Amino acid sequence: GALYFGYIYYNSHFVNPWQSSSDKAGSASVVDNYSEDVQTAAAAFNLPYEYLMALIQLECSGIRPAGERFEPHVFRRLQAVRDGKRKNYENITPSHLANASDEALRNLATSWGPFQLMGYKCILLDVQIRDIRGDRGVYHGVNWINITYGDRLRRGEYKNCFHMHNTGRTYPRVGLPTTHDPQYVPRGLAGITRYKLNS
């Protein structure tokens, strides 16, 4: 029991060596593909360049164009909102989804762009999905970050911000992180140091 808990604790608080090596190798892609756009957006919203670069590495590994990821559980929740079986999902209400087809909901339940924003986040930004996955994806992603947790980010709450980006909630005061990958937050924090040195 204690050995297992120790492993889980270590894995969620420290970057393991093989992940660290992979992140260092992949950082060149992030710089080559996104550095200029991130510098512009970071300045426009007064957000830390190094955090945004580390987040891009976590979310899309610096690949441009970034991939997409469909989330079936989000799709089911959005269907329930549209069909009147659920009052809301985050800031999405039935009025936002009136007459939306299943294909439209599928796009809203897919993450897009360098920050892998869920399609339904476009509603808050008042943009189209093609905007967050297109040439201005960095700008729209940073705008969403600014609206959602920008004040925390400007205060340097990096641990909370990485956790919020992935889960929608701050880092737990007690217990383990609830990110999809237990290495998500420690890898992000290590990335901040790496990109600060390269800025």
Regions found by a protein language model. Give the residues of each.
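Non-catalytic cell-wall polysaccharide-engagement segments
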Residues: 1-16, 27-33, 37, 43-45, ...
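A composition-driven signal for long, intrinsically disordered, charge-rich low-complexity tracts
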Residues: 16-17, 55
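Active-site flanking loop/helix segments enriched in acidic
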Residues: 18-24
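Cell wall/extracellular polymer interaction/catalysis modules
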Residues: 25-33, 37-57, 62-65
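Charged mid-protein connector segments
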Residues: 64-65, 72-88
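Short, solvent-exposed loop/turn and secondary-structure capping segments
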Residues: 65-70, 175-177
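Juxtamembrane/interface motifs at transmembrane-helix termini
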Residues: 70-76, 179-184
